[in-house]
């Protein structure tokens, strides 16, 4: 990752204070356009400030709403903003909330005086103590969200109690080692006979093997409410066609095939489609095929089938990538493939419609960060609408 001087006015290539160069990614279109800052957490870490402060500062300076999903490392500013513009604003943030007024080094630590609601800082480079200008809106955010205090172990290390604890631990360690040495030597067992290889390569190989054998699980006769056997056979044939031809065929060709088989309006076809063209580790896949899924998902039933297909895909691969569930659901939401209402219904309870109830519960638990964020975002939106209505009434 490219790095730059924290103080960009310093041209010294050996300047010790460095940070990642800000990256921006514009997503969506129209009223839903937004700017994502993928490396915000890395930048904030280099500056010694929470990502919340920097993101909110951008929002205040640009007059834009911000969205922060810390669990998924997503920091978003509404509107289209290029990296250069944001980098310039970051310089302003650094001058106002990071640099020491005395030595101009970025080695300051913030502290909050709860009594008078002021923000002061200590410079670890020169020892200067100063106060942050409280006129900027961000100071209110900092006071409400104070930086985490660093734990100090100095007094514990210097105290007699600490020495006694260290001595006790050493004595305990010696006893454990002595008793372990007296234990009889266990018979050596060949680990290769039973151990599960958890290395990254082995996990990837198992996922590929599971996906390769997915054709057997694509038979949808076990889905509730299946139609006649002849129609079910069409889904099987469609799944086999995808297995044989994808990724050699485009989304347009896939849609033409679905129309040819007269299943382009069927929710069960979406379940098959998700399992066949969404590949691990899944992030970015729904955005890649967004136009196709948007064309197919025209009702609540279709949207539920898309989520069901993703659940079944996770089950087929034994939940190996369950940690990406919040990111994938956010991607589905941001590409307008599933509505807020459907996500709310889906998240309300685990269902065994597409997978076992146990698997569904695990997926719902993994999805909790996304579902919580969605509920909070919905509440904020309703609150803003009510405020606008009140303003209109006042006029």
Swiss-Prot record:
A molecular-function term among this protein's GO annotations: translation initiation factor activity
Family annotation (InterPro entries): ARM-type_fold (IPR016024), IF2/IF5 (IPR045196), Transl_init_fac_IF2/IF5_dom (IPR002735), Transl_init_fac_IF2/IF5_N (IPR016189), Transl_init_fac_IF2/IF5_Zn-bd (IPR016190), W2_domain (IPR003307)
Xref: Gene3D superfamilies: 1.25.40.180, 2.20.25.350, 3.30.30.170
Biased composition (Acidic residues): 161-170, 377-395
Highest taxon of the lineage: Eukaryota
Residues annotated as domain W2: 228-384
BP-aspect Gene Ontology terms: cytosolic ribosome assembly; formation of cytoplasmic translation initiation complex
Region (Disordered): 146-171, 374-395
Biased composition (Basic residues): 147-157
List of residues binding GTP: 28-35
SMART domains given in the database record: eIF2B_5 (SM00653), eIF5C (SM00515)
Keywords carried by this UniProt record: GTP-binding, Initiation factor, Nucleotide-binding, Protein biosynthesis
GO cellular component annotations of the record: cytosol; eukaryotic 48S preinitiation complex
PANTHER family xrefs: EUKARYOTIC TRANSLATION INITIATION FACTOR (PTHR23001), EUKARYOTIC TRANSLATION INITIATION FACTOR 5 (PTHR23001:SF7)
Role description: Catalyzes the hydrolysis of GTP bound to the 40S ribosomal initiation complex (40S.mRNA.Met-tRNA[F].eIF-2.GTP) with the subsequent joining of a 60S ribosomal subunit resulting in the release of eIF-2 and the guanine nucleotide. The subsequent joining of a 60S ribosomal subunit results in the formation of a functional 80S initiation complex (80S.mRNA.Met-tRNA[F]).
Record note on quaternary structure: Monomer.
Protein family (similarity comment): Belongs to the eIF-2-beta/eIF-5 family.
Name the UniProt record assigns to this protein: Probable eukaryotic translation initiation factor 5
């Amino acid at each position: 990752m490219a790095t730059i001087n924290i103080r960009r006015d310093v041209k010294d290539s050996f300047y010790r204070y460095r940070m990642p160069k800000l990256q921006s990614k514009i997503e969506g279109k129209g009223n839903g356009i937004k700017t994502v800052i993928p490396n915000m957490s890395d930048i904030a870490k280099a500056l010694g400030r929470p990502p919340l402060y920097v993101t909110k500062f951008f929002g205040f300076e640009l007059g834009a709403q911000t969205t922060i999903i810390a669990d998924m490392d997503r920091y978003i500013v509404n509107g289209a903003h290029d990296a250069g513009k944001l980098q310039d604003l970051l310089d302003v943030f650094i001058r106002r909330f990071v640099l020491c007024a005395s030595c101009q080094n970025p080695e300051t630590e913030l502290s909050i005086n709860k009594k008078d609601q002021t923000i002061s800082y200590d410079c670890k480079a020169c020892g200067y103590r100063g106060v942050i200008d409280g006129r900027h809106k961000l100071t209110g955010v900092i006071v409400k969200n104070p930086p985490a205090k660093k734990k100090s172990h100095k007094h514990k290390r210097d105290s007699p109690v600490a020495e006694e604890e260290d001595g006790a631990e050493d004595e305990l360690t010696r006893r454990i080692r002595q008793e372990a040495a007296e234990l009889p030597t266990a018979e050596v067992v060949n680990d290769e006979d039973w151990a599960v290889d958890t290395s990254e390569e082995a996990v990837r190989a198992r996922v590929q093997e599971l996906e390769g054998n997915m054709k057997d699980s694509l038979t949808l006769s076990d889905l509730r409410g299946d139609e006649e056997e002849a129609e079910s056979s069409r889904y099987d044939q469609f799944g086999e066609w995808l297995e044989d031809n994808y990724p050699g065929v485009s989304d347009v060709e896939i849609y033409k095939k679905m129309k040819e088989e007269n299943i382009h309006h069927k929710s069960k076809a979406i379940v098959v489609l998700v399992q066949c063209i969404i590949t691990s580790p899944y992030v970015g896949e729904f955005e890649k095929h967004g136009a196709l899924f948007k064309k197919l998902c025209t009702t609540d039933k279709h949207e539920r089938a898309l989520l069901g297909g993703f659940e079944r895909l996770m089950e087929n691969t034994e939940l190996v990538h369950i940690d990406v569930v919040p990111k994938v659901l956010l991607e589905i939401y941001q590409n307008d493939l599933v509505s807020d209402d459907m996500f709310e219904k889906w998240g309300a309870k685990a269902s065994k419609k597409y997978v076992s109830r146990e698997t569904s519960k695990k997926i719902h638990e993994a999805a909790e960060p996304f579902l919580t964020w969605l509920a909070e975002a919905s509440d904020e939106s309703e609150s803003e609408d009510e405020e606008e209505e009140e303003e209109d009434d006042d006029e």
